[in-house]
Regions:
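N-terminal secretory signal peptides that target proteins for export/translocation
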Residues: 1-2
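Bacterial N-terminal signal peptides
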Residues: 5-16
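Cleaved targeting-peptide boundary
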Residues: 20-28
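Short, contiguous alpha-helical
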Residues: 36-47, 59-100, 142-195
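Well-ordered alpha-helical scaffold segments within catalytic/enzyme domains
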Residues: 45, 49-50, 84, 124, ...
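Surface-exposed helix-capping loop/turn segments at secondary-structure junctions
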Residues: 52-60, 128-138, 177-184
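Acidic/histidine-rich alpha-helical segments that form the ligand environment
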Residues: 105-143, 151-167
């Protein structure tokens, strides 16, 4: 039986290509990595959004029943600490005025104060994510809120945090559009360099 050189080449080529592929399995902590990447993107958009909204608009709300932009900023700060506090052993150190001042008062703080506190809470969350891995996602943690406590998995806290940030980014993006400001996610993306 005669084997043609073409047949040998067709059979050998895929084997040689597979051998050249870098070995390795899935990335370490793929679930945590996905949540971290999504959350960091939302943080970036939220920071850009609040940076681009003029201070005069921080009292804006579309209807009397809705939250002001300033209220949303301070609320995000509180939520970031609430969720990210449960990602591991690291806990935030907050000044008494940050924990004892009523939300309605914090909502009227100057823009630079609110944005600085928001960015500090983002940094805390980034550091909290660094101590988290997939093996810890099933751990039970105690969530205490408004005087009530309940058990929840760390995965629930990570998912809750991502959903909360997406919800508030959507809210701020709508407020921005109502004020003729383009939200960060709608801005043209820079051109990628061609190779």
């Amino acid at each position: 039986m005669k084997i043609s050189y073409a047949a040998v080449l067709v059979l050998a080529l895929p084997v040689s290509l597979v051998a050249q592929q870098p070995s390795g399995g899935p990335p370490a902590n793929p679930v945590t990595a996905v949540f971290r990447a999504r959350t960091m993107g939302l943080q970036r958009n939220l920071a850009q959004a609040f940076d681009s909204i003029p201070e005069a608009k921080f009292g804006y709300r579309p209807t009397p029943a809705q939250q002001t932009i300033g209220y949303i900023a301070q609320h995000l700060v509180s939520d970031n600490y609430l969720f990210c506090n449960q990602f591991g052993a690291m806990k935030p150190t907050l000044a008494p005025k940050d924990t004892a001042t009523a939300d309605s008062v914090k909502a009227k703080w100057p823009k630079d104060t609110l944005v600085a506190k928001l960015k500090a809470s983002f940094t805390f969350c980034e550091n909290a994510f660094a101590q988290l891995d997939d093996a810890k996602l099933a751990d039970q943690v105690t969530l205490s809120f408004n005087g009530q406590s309940r058990q929840i998995t760390r995965a629930g806290m990570v998912l809750g945090h991502a959903l909360d940030m997406a919800d508030h980014y959507s809210q701020i993006a709508n407020y921005m559009r109502l004020n003729n400001i383009l939200p960060p996610s709608a801005l043209p993306r820079p051109a990628r360099p061609s190779n």
